[in-house]
């Protein structure tokens, strides 16, 4: 656009001014173009390092002979923020791919996906996590699927899963137009950290209870020290009752002996 404004200009003061404006506009356009591509400058194998996040390449495979040959399906755009949000960009299936997917579905074949686990490793040495569904469920769902990327607590990819909606195969007829575009929902599944024991709070509460007891020594008295005025009368009563019972038994025994001597 900037170069085009130099064409057909007449020589003269006005032409010189317009030419100057065009040369000023050209660097501005170049700067704007460079800024728009900042997130796509550094490309790796399977993943692209970006200042605004990580581009994780999503591949799929569906072959008539049940062999595995992965091709690019799209990209998972992984934000570098603390919220760990993720979005997806996908290609449209070609006519040949749609026909092949139908044929594989009729043969009860599998539809596979994969993503790389590590960043900065060549494709030959890289490790992938994979998942699959039946190709017929992919067809009958009209390419409506849900992909979940599973990560560890540090954010590293440890697994991937895919499900279709619906997930059954009933032999339903599907129009060719329904197999052009993917309708995908993608999630990040991160482990939930277990609750940390409140050790410090427990120790603090225990120390407060001990300090409270130290301030009130009355609470630390033994059971006897607290209730001796009730215990002693009961003990004395039991002792006196036992002594009177013993005296009565002795008197009855003496009377019986006297009767025997009279005979």
Swiss-Prot record:
Question: Which residues are on the Lumenal side of the membrane?
Answer: 35-222
Main location class: endoplasmic reticulum
**Which one GO biological process term can you cite for this protein?**
tail-anchored membrane protein insertion into ER membrane
Record flagged with keyword tRNA-binding? no
Residues spanning the signal sequence: 1-34
TM spans, by residue?
223-243
Q: Which residues lie on this side of the membrane: Cytoplasmic?
A: 244-263
List the record's Gene Ontology CC terms alphabetically: EMC complex; endoplasmic reticulum membrane; membrane
Q: Which PANTHER family match?
A: CHROMATIN COMPLEXES SUBUNIT BAP18-RELATED, ER MEMBRANE PROTEIN COMPLEX SUBUNIT 10
Annotated family = Belongs to the EMC10 family.
Q: What is this protein called?
A: ER membrane protein complex subunit 10
The record's gene field reads emc10
């Amino acid at each position: 656009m900037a170069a085009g404004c130099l064409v057909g200009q007449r020589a003269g003061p006005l032409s010189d001014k317009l030419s100057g404006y065009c040369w000023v506009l050209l660097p501005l356009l170049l700067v704007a173009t460079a800024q728009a591509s900042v997130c796509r400058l550094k490309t790796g194998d399977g993943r692209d390092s970006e200042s605004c996040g990580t581009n994780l390449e999503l591949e799929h495979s569906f072959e008539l002979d049940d062999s595995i040959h992965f091709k690019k399906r799209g990209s998972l755009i992984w934000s570098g923020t603390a919220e760990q949000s993720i979005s997806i960009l996908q290609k449209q299936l070609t006519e040949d791919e749609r026909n092949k997917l139908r044929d594989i579905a009729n043969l009860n074949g599998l539809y596979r996906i994969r993503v790389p686990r590590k960043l900065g490793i060549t494709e030959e040495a890289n490790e992938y996590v994979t998942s699959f569904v039946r190709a017929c469920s992919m067809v009958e769902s009209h390419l409506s699927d849900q992909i979940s990327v599973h990560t560890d607590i540090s954010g590293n990819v440890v697994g991937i899963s895919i499900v279709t909606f619906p997930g059954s195969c009933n032999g339903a007829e599907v129009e060719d137009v329904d197999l052009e575009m993917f309708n995908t929902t993608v999630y990040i599944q991160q482990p939930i950290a277990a609750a940390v024991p409140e050790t410090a709070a427990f120790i603090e509460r225990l120390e407060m209870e001990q300090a409270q007891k130290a301030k009130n020594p009355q609470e630390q008295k033994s059971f006897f020290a607290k209730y001796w005025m009730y215990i002693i009368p009961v003990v004395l009563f039991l002792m006196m009752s036992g002594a009177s019972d013993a005296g009565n038994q002795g008197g009855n025994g003496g009377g019986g002996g006297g009767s025997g001597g009279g005979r």
